[in-house]
Amino acid sequence: MSGGKGKAGSSEKASTSRSAKAGLTFPVGRVHRLLRKGNYAQRVGSGAPVYLTSVLEYLAAEILELAGNAARDNKKSRIIPRHLQLAIRNDEELNKLLGHVTIAQGGVLPNIHQSLLPAKKAKAGNASQEL
């Protein structure tokens, strides 16, 4: 008689996470839990955490790619807050999204006002053309 809870005859497959099903690296289950516990709404649909997780993963990848480029431009192999600051402030859309965000140890963008720069000298060739 085989009527028990034995493993014989059962074809259990390993459970796959919602992150793996969606092809994401960020945790869908954790985002779903945070949405439920955060009192954002009484109920949270099953697609909302997947969509939000994919958006968060995309933003993180975008910022890290630009920060990696900034680190490489400065001949560094490690991303520091300064590189994050440069990446965000030099990108128009990210700067608009994170305009009021302060990044600790980020510094400021290098900027010299035009009136403080030395005046350009006129070329000698221009005087002969006016005659």
Swiss-Prot record:
Domain notes: The [ST]-Q motif constitutes a recognition sequence for kinases from the PI3/PI4-kinase family.
One Pfam family from the record: Histone_H2A_C
Region of interest called Disordered, as start-end residue ranges on this chain: 1-22
Remaining remarks: In contrast to vertebrates and insects, its C-terminus is not monoubiquitinated.
Oligomeric form and interacting partners: The nucleosome is a histone octamer containing two molecules each of H2A, H2B, H3 and H4 assembled in one H3-H4 heterotetramer and two H2A-H2B heterodimers. The octamer wraps approximately 147 bp of DNA.
Region forming the signal peptide: none
CDD domains xrefs: HFD_H2A
UniProt-recorded name of the protein: Histone H2A.2
Family statement: Belongs to the histone H2A family.
InterPro entries reported in the protein's UniProt record: Histone-fold, Histone_H2A, Histone_H2A/H2B/H3, Histone_H2A_C, Histone_H2A_CS
Function: Core component of nucleosome which plays a central role in DNA double strand break (DSB) repair. Nucleosomes wrap and compact DNA into chromatin, limiting DNA accessibility to the cellular machineries which require DNA as a template. Histones thereby play a central role in transcription regulation, DNA repair, DNA replication and chromosomal stability. DNA accessibility is regulated via a complex set of post-translational modifications of histones, also called histone code, and nucleosome remodeling.
Annotated positions of the N-acetylserine modification: S2
Keywords, sorted A to Z: Acetylation, Chromosome, DNA damage, DNA repair, DNA-binding, Methylation, Nucleosome core, Nucleus, Phosphoprotein
Modified residues (N5-methylglutamine): Q105
UniProt gene name: HTA2
